[in-house]
Amino acid sequence: EWIIYIGDSGGNQTGMENAANRLNAEGGSRKGLFIPEFYDNAGVQQHMEETFGIYEESEGWHDNYWLSAMQAAVDPETVRYEERVQAGRASINGVSLVPLGRPIAVGEELMNWRTDHTIAAIRAAMGM
């Protein structure tokens, strides 16, 4: 039985790695795998740049176009699109969210990339 630890919060990476290591130290039939590749935000951003030619310049907030694009692909309400458009703030780090179909398409591709990247890391960690 495999227990796989993945997460998208930087503050949780060490704890997940420690949990997997502790489980493995106990022996037994369960094996823990910590998969840091899921949290490869630099890789996600690089894929966005190379695939779509979208480059961000941080505005100093804890916000990224690529992350909002993935959120929009799952549920556009989470990026408050209508409110942003009405307030004249429909961009993140200099990249427009208008029209909404564009960040949704970008988000879908980035989620596919992240999924493939993570699955490859899991398979490698399992020796497959």
Predicted regions and their residues:
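Extended, histidine- and acidic-residue-enriched regions that form the cofactor-binding/catalytic faces
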Residues: 1-128
